[in-house]
Design a protein with these regions (language model features):
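Short, small-residue-biased leader/transition segments that mark boundaries at the very start
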Residues: 1-7
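Basic polycationic patches enriched in arginine
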Residues: 8-14
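Conserved short alpha-helical segments that host acidic/polar catalytic motifs at enzyme active sites
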Residues: 17-191
C-alpha cells in the first residue's frame, strides 16, 4: 500500500503544469542543464522556439552555436581543447521541409532521417535512449514544430534513465495542438 500511494503521489505531482517566468526560473538555478522552449508568439502569427546549453566540464563548455543552412550546429570554440566530441558536437536545430526539429543531441539527425523515411517523431525516438555519459545519463530532450491547417502543432519529448538507473529508459512525449497565443512549453534536462 505504501508504494502504491507513493506512485500515485508522484503521478499527481508530474501531471501538474504551472505557468512560470522562464527568465526568473533560469536565473534562480545555478545549473539548469539544457532546455527547449516551444510556443506561439503573442500576436499569434509565429511559432517560437529557443534552445540553451550549459556545460560542467571544460570539454562541454568549449562549444558555440553556428548557423548551418536552415539549422544550427555546435562547434568547438577552441579545437585544441576538444576531447570527446560524441556528446557535444551535433546539430540542435534542423529543418525538414516545413518541420523544425530541436534537440539536445545527435538525435536531431535520427528524427530527421527517420521522418524523411515516413516515420513519426515518436517512432524516431524509439530508436534512442538517454545519453551514455555515466554517471549522469543525461536525458535526451527533443521538440518538433509541424504546420497544420492555418497554424501549427508541436510535440516535446524526454528520454531519461529511471532515477539514474540505466537499466530502464523512461519515455515521455507531450503533444500540443493549436497552441494559445503568447504561451509555450519548456522541457529541460536537470531542473
Amino acid at each position: 500500500v505504501g508504494s502504491e500511494m507513493c506512485i500515485r503521489d508522484r503521478l499527481k505531482r508530474r501531471s501538474i503544469m504551472k505557468k512560470i517566468d522562464i527568465y526568473e526560473e533560469l536565473k534562480s538555478n545555478d545549473y539548469p542543464g539544457r532546455g527547449i522552449v516551444i510556443g506561439k508568439s503573442a500576436d499569434g502569427k509565429s511559432a517560437v522556439t529557443a534552445y540553451f546549453i550549459m556545460g560542467r566540464s571544460v570539454n562541454s563548455r568549449n562549444r558555440v552555436f553556428i548557423e548551418d543552412g536552415d539549422g544550427i550546429r555546435t562547434q568547438a570554440f577552441d579545437p585544441s581543447k576538444l576531447e570527446d566530441p560524441h556528446l557535444i558536437i551535433y546539430a540542435p536545430v534542423r529543418v525538414l521541409g516545413d518541420k523544425t526539429i530541436v534537440t539536445n543531441g545527435d538525435q536531431t539527425d535520427t528524427i530527421y532521417e527517420h521522418m524523411e523515411n515516413g516515420q513519426t517523431f515518436e517512432q524516431s525516438l524509439r530508436t534512442r535512449e538517454f545519453e551514455d555519459d555515466d554517471p549522469n545519463f543525461t536525458p535526451r530532450i527533443s521538440g518538433i514544430i509541424e504546420p497544420n491547417k492555418g497554424g501549427f502543432d508541436y510535440s516535446m519529448s524526454i528520454l531519461k534513465s529511471a532515477d539514474g538507473n540505466p537499466q530502464s529508459c523512461q519515455r515521455y512525449t507531450f503533444s500540443y495542438n493549436n497552441p494559445l497565443d503568447g504561451e509555450g512549453h519548456f522541457i529541460h534536462t536537470y531542473m
